[in-house]
Curated annotation (Swiss-Prot):
Pfam families: PsaA_PsaB (PF00223). Belongs to the PsaA/PsaB family. Chlorophyll a B1 binds at residue 654. The keyword Oxidoreductase applies. InterPro entries: PSI_PsaA/B, PSI_PsaA/B_CS, PSI_PsaA/B_sf, PSI_PsaB. HAMAP family: PSI_PsaB (MF_00482). This is Photosystem I P700 chlorophyll a apoprotein A2. It catalyses: reduced [plastocyanin] + hnu + oxidized [2Fe-2S]-[ferredoxin] = oxidized [plastocyanin] + reduced [2Fe-2S]-[ferredoxin]. The lineage of its organism: Eukaryota, Viridiplantae, Streptophyta, Embryophyta, Tracheophyta. It is found in: Plastid, Chloroplast thylakoid membrane. Chlorophyll a B3 binds at residues 662, 670. It is a multi-pass membrane protein. One of its GO terms (molecular function) is magnesium ion binding.
């Protein structure tokens, strides 16, 4: 018999129903469950797939560069970054009528185009790219890297080049390589690029390979480095009147600590960023030489962890046993990596708008909104994934004997206390926050707004003041001109920093009031509830009082039949599934808050946010309804405009989202009946019944239907908000 899909599971391949296809797709990447898998092949497959992933990333980024060079307007944007709309790529659509062609022909283009809201123009401009030729060169280089990655992936699957399991489990070598080789060297290389190419470009000097060795980044070259006069590199920075990209007002410094923003570009000083990357490079290059490999010196990770036994014995055996537990579990390692990456991605979202690194990006409001929202959603999915793999670790890889009385075992031993505390925090936050919102809502509805309960966030205001914000009147730390902290930084970074914090045109330490206090606690409710569901799912993954043998059923099971009532919805997968809804809900509140606060700031009517954000109807009417009105006006006598595509996407997003409920609310029996009726009709319809299928059609399993429903819910939710966000922002600010 010919091999049928899936080849990795002979049991599934012989299944006579459509379950073969869906289960095959569902388990395609679960290498551990495949036939004939060995630990060695598992590690090698994952290693090779990493190169495939890199190839895809390089190909994708190469495509960005190529399409902007081919169809964009980078060179004219460079001449006037604040007024020319950056073009992502052309739109080719044979169905377009003349009104559509006119509506989407903008940014100086000859035909319909998409505007770029990704910030790539600002990024490329900041790092020294200036011409389409530069972009083509970059695209070709990335294409080359993509090909190299594919070759490397293929190579490491060949018998002679397959790494051994011991190589994959050599923790110290991997740490040294990643810390020094990847983070350290790449940060140093980036410092070099900023100093040799980007900073000269910001001062009107065009450095490329042909003059790279002739143009000194600093008048004194390497002299100050070798004579120990490093402070010379910080002297004579760009002046506050510097015009970015020209020599006018430019200085000669390359590594500075100015603080604050470049007055014209509203972004961090390039020389500050070069200095930052040099410091990061130094730290990581040192860190990457700390672990014991070939020379018998340095730390051993196992010794480090085994030595971590807290004195007093109150935390048992501390970190004993953790080295082997982590080093032998890919799910544990993936969980740690995803947790770290998720937090970093969220930090990127927060810092990209408050401390913009790219020239002129702060004045491109739609791009700011899109990048914040994009990174927060990505962070949410990555963080929930961390807990999913944590749960799979507990089910598949955790060994109680190996971890007796260490911190991991103790987490499991007192999971009831952890879960109940999280539950208490969620309930407290939920009832109090909703209570305040509802009270205020009723007061507004009855025409007595003065009876609202409005709480000033005094602790947060105090923290902002400690960092130098003076408008609240707290005389503390950096907002106190007499304090030692103020005087210590006065001669270096502090003037630039204080200027940035107290200038109301940027997003650094926005002024906060009762509306912020309330939405902060609503977001805290969402974060704690999402965490509660995820933590409970992982800690109860092996078993609970209700179902002590849960680990024997695996990661995702629907129920243990009718014999044990109450075992439905308690698999670790079900916890992940529920948590994703809460994650999306929370990030919805986060992005609503960020976007509304910023559009009122950009429009100069902050009082709208301050007055309307303290009650629910304010959010519904003055944020959601008011800003979606352009997207829901249907056909009008003015015909098509450039927001029409977002109006369509807004509608389509709602459709996809609503489709999710079809899978979430009706289960197998309903679908099985429907499928059998459809199959009956098909077999009795002339012509149609000439088409037969080999697999008997059966309904999706409960778990699969939930996954399909969750996927539609998530995609529709994000599509809808993306269209709303981009249209409402670009409709106001271009």
């Amino acid at each position: 018999m010919a091999l049928r899909f899936p080849r990795f599971s002979q049991g599934l391949a012989q299944d006579p129903t459509t379950r073969r296809i869906w289960f095959g797709i569902a388990t395609a990447h679960d290498f551990e469950s495949h036939d004939d898998i060995t630990e060695e092949r598992l590690y090698q497959n994952i290693f090779a797939s990493h190169f495939g992933q890199l190839a895809i990333i390089f190909l994708w980024t190469s495509g960005n560069l190529f399409h902007v060079a081919w169809q964009g307007n980078f060179e004219s944007w460079v001449q006037d970054p604040l007024h020319v709309r950056p073009i992502a790529h052309a739109i080719w659509d044979p169905h377009f009528g003349q009104p559509a062609v006119e509506a989407f022909t903008r940014g100086g283009a000859l035909g319909p185009v998409n505007i770029a809201y990704s910030g790539v123009y600002q990024w490329w401009y900041t790092i020294g790219l200036r011409t389409n030729e530069d972009l083509y060169t970059g695209a070709l280089f990335l294409l080359f890297l993509s090909a190299i990655s594919l070759i490397a992936g293929w190579l490491h699957l060949q018998p002679k080049w397959k790494p051994s399991v011991s190589w994959f489990k050599n923790a110290e070598s991997r740490l040294n390589h990643h810390l020094s080789g990847l983070f350290g060297v790449s940060s140093l290389a980036w410092t070099g690029h900023l100093v040799h190419v980007a900073i000269p470009a910001s001062r009107g000097e065009y450095v490329r390979w042909n003059n790279f060795l002739d143009v000194l980044p600093h008048p004194q070259g390497l002299g100050p480095l070798f004579t120990g006069q490093w402070n010379l590199y910080a002297q004579n920075p760009d002046s506050s009147s510097h015009l970015f990209g020209t020599a006018e007002g430019a200085g000669t410094a390359i590594l500075t600590l100015l603080g604050g923003f470049h007055p014209q570009t509203q972004s961090l000083w390039l020389t500050d960023m070069a200095h930052h990357h040099l410091a990061i490079a130094f730290i990581f290059l040192v860190a990457g030489h700390m672990y014991r490999t070939n020379f018998g010196i340095g730390h051993s990770m196992k010794d480090l962890l085994d030595a971590h036994i807290p004195p007093g014995g109150r935390l048992g055996r501390g970190h004993k046993g953790l080295y082997d537990t982590i080093n032998n579990s890919l799910h544990f390692q993936l969980g740690l990596a995803l947790a770290s990456l998720g937090v970093i991605t969220s930090l990127v979202a927060q810092h990209m708008y408050s401390l913009p690194a790219y020239a002129f990006i702060a004045q491109d409001f739609t791009t700011q909104a899109a990048l914040y929202t994009h990174h927060q959603y990505i962070a949410g999915f990555i963080m929930t994934g961390a807990f999913a793999h944590g749960a799979i670790f507990f089910i598949r890889d955790y060994n109680p004997e190996q971890n007796e009385d260490n911190v991991l075992a103790r987490m499991l031993d007192h999971k009831e206390a952890i879960i109940s505390h999280l539950s208490w925090a969620s309930l407290f936050l939920g009832f109090h926050t909703l209570g305040l919102y509802v009270h205020n809502d009723v007061m507004l509805a009855f025409g007595t707004p003065e009876k609202q309960i409005l709480i000033e966030p005094i602790f947060a205001q105090w923290i902002q003041s400690a960092h130098g914000k003076t408008s609240y009147g707290f005389d503390v730390l950096l907002s106190s001109t007499t304090g030692p902290a103020f005087n210590a930084g006065r001669s270096i970074w502090l003037p630039g920093w204080l200027n940035a914090v107290n200038e109301n045109s940027n997003s650094l330490f926005l002024t906060i009031g009762p509306g912020d206090f309330l939405v902060h606690h609503a977001i805290a409710l969402g974060l704690h509830t999402t965490t509660l569901i995820l933590v409970k799912g992982a800690l109860d993954a092996r078993g609970s009082k209700l179902m002590p043998d849960k680990k024997d059923f695996g990661y995702s099971f629907p129920c243990d039949g009718p014999g044990r009532g109450g075992t439905c919805d308690i698999s670790a997968w079900d916890a992940f599934y529920l948590a994703v809804f809460w994650m999306l809900n929370t990030i919805g509140w986060v992005t609503f808050y960020w976007h509304w606060k910023h559009i009122t700031l950009w429009q100069g009517n902050v009082s709208q946010f301050n007055e309307s954000s303290t009650y629910l109807m304010g959010w519904l009417r003055d944020y959601l309804w008011l800003n979606s009105s352009q997207l829901i006006n249907g056909y009008n006598p003015f015909g098509m405009n450039s927001l029409s595509v977002w109006a369509w996407m807004f509608l389509f997003g709602h459709l996809v989202w609503a489709t999710g409920f079809m899978f979430l609310i009706s289960w197998r029996g309903y679908w099985q009946e429907l499928i059998e009726t459809l199959a009956w009709a098909h077999e009795r319809t002339p012509l149609a019944n000439l088409i037969r299928w080999r697999d008997k059609p059966v309904a999706l399993s409960i778990v699969q239907a939930r996954l399909v429903g969750l996927a539609h819910f998530s995609v529709g939710y994000i599509f809808t908000y993306a269209a709303f966000l981009i249209a409402s922002t670009s409709g106001k600010f271009g």
